[in-house]
Amino acid sequence: MTRMAEKPISPTKTRTRFEDIQAHYDVSDDFFALFQDPTRTYSCAYFEPPELTLEEAQYAKVDLNLDKLDLKPGMTLLDIGCGWGTTMRRAVERLDVNVIGLTLSKNQHARCEQVLASIDTNRSRQVLLQGWEDFAEPVDRIVSIEAFEHFGHENYDDFFKRCFNIMPADGRMTVQSSVSYHPYEMAARGKKLSFETARFIKFIVTEIFPGGRLPSTEMMVEHGEKAGFTVPEPLSLRPHYIKTLRIWGDTLQSNKDKAIEVTSEEVYNRYMKYLRGCEHYFTDEMLDCSLVTYLKPGAAA
């Protein structure tokens, strides 16, 4: 596998991203557990077939991503923004691969170490408390599920170049991300970016995901192609996110007293506003969730 030439990373930029991620994901593991399913997965589930439970649908989402990667036993999978470790565990147990996870959350790092240590396997498992900017080891495949929102538009070219260069000629990657639309796209679909919508998006990227910026699906495709990837038609998961958000909101609401006890009423209200608001805007087709697959030339041939 080819190693890429290192590009210096700004210490200030890296430190800021650490602070942004920890501001959200290190609120309290006990708090997130009050509305997440037992997989501790914090991203859009995949309800196919529709009668799946949330836990089953989260595994279906993980499998949907992994199945697009053509993983073989003994390969090494890099999980960028690995959350609480469910995707890595699934990959090891189901596909017999080595895994490396990247996270900027201290809480997630600690839990991932426990999850990976509990797997009965001889495969290599490691989780690193660092960003993709500082990672340059060769890997065979890459998965990134709803971490892309944290990367920043100005870093997309660097991200895709780095991912392209650390994979072999037949490398594959999936990136799943919440997305917004350009005002021109909304106008073409008979939608209008209202002040209320813009204010809610600002609320998300300042109070829920500090430093975050939603891409458009077109940006995800264009920057990937610019780096050399072939990008098949992206998959919209919007209906699945509506259902995921509704379940999360209902579950957190039913655990209101416990949520306030482990955090505060302000945190509870902020997350209820986030979950209910996102459900509304996904339903209204103002937001979407895209699963995009990236193929290097050897995989696209």
UniProtKB/Swiss-Prot annotation:
Gene3D superfamilies: Vaccinia Virus protein VP39 (3.40.50.150). Pathway: Lipid metabolism; mycolic acid biosynthesis. GO terms for biological process: methylation; mycolic acid biosynthetic process. The keyword S-adenosyl-L-methionine applies. Keywords: Lipid biosynthesis, Lipid metabolism, Methyltransferase, S-adenosyl-L-methionine, Transferase. The active site is at residue 278. Pfam families: CMAS. It comes from the Bacteria. GO terms for molecular function: methyltransferase activity. S-adenosyl-L-methionine binds at residues 42-43, 81-83, 103-108, 132-133, 145. The keyword Transmembrane does not apply. InterPro entries: CFA/CMAS (IPR050723), CMAS (IPR003333), CMAS_actinobact (IPR047672), SAM-dependent_MTases_sf (IPR029063). Its EC number is 2.1.1.-. NCBIfam families: mycolic_MTase. Involved in the biosynthesis of hydroxymycolate, a common precursor of oxygenated mycolic acids (methoxymycolate and ketomycolate). Probably transfers a methyl group from the S-adenosylmethionine (SAM) cofactor and, subsequently or simultaneously, a water molecule onto the double bound of ethylene substrates, leading to the formation of the hydroxylated product at the distal position. Belongs to the CFA/CMAS family. Monomer. This is Hydroxymycolate synthase MmaA4. The gene is cmaA.
